[in-house]
Regions:
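Membrane-interface helix-boundary signature
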Residues: 3-7, 11, 35-38, 65, ...
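Functionally critical transmembrane alpha-helices in membrane proteins and complexes, commonly lining
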Residues: 5-59, 71-80
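Membrane-interface starts of transmembrane alpha-helices
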Residues: 6-13, 126-137, 150
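Interfacial loop-to-helix transition and helix-capping segments at the boundaries
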Residues: 34-46, 97-112, 145-162
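Membrane-interface alpha-helices at helix entry/exit sites of multi-pass transporters
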Residues: 63-71
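Membrane-interface helix-loop-helix regions
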Residues: 70-123, 131-147
Length: 174
């Protein structure tokens, strides 16, 4: 098995910063330093994850073929388990209408977004000016408090420029 050490190092750093950021979130009101560190991490960490996801999505056919198995099914499973967990903690009765497939709980939005981006990438890649167009769409979402689906659609559109930027990025560009 060939391991790309730079990829592993970059992902490890981002995951470490994400965990650190979530830890800092609990204490940011108690310390100015922690609040500043929290803000520094949150300025770029999701954008970097999305950019890397786009960068590692060069094979558009494979992306579409594996999107359901790699992203949608885990999303459904973990979103449902999160729904069960929240219902258990809150003592809420389970109901068919309580679980909403397209309303991701917490961080599940990222799996849902990856599924959408991977499914749409082959079509997006055919659009000549997709990067500037995605930037305009991303900025446009800022004009609305929500596009629906509990902010999932807003996040999908607003992070699309980073995904497409990663997809279009070539190492020779550095």
């Amino acid at each position: 098995i060939k391991i790309d050490n730079q990829k592993v190092d970059c992902l490890f750093l981002l995951i470490f910063l994400m965990v650190l950021g979530h830890t800092f979130e609990q204490f940011r009101s108690e310390s100015t330093v922690i609040s500043i560190l929290f803000s520094c991490i949150y300025v770029f960490h999701m954008e970097a994850f999305v950019f890397l996801a786009g960068y590692h999505s060069k094979d558009t056919t494979k992306c579409r073929e594996t999107a359901v198995e790699r992203f949608f099914l885990p999303y459904v499973l973990f979103n449902f388990l999160t729904y069960l967990w929240i219902a258990l903690i809150n003592g809420t009765k389970l109901s068919v209408t309580g679980f909403q497939l397209f309303s991701p709980h917490s961080t599940m939005w990222f799996l849902f977004a990856l599924f959408v981006w991977k499914m749409m990438l082959k079509d997006f890649a055919r659009i000549r000016l997709i990067l500037p167009l995605s930037i305009l769409l991303g900025l446009g979402t800022g004009m609305f408090s929500s596009l629906g689906i509990h902010d999932s659609l807003t996040r999908i559109v607003s992070f699309l420029p980073f995904f497409m930027g990663g997809y279009l990025f070539q190492p020779e560009m550095l």
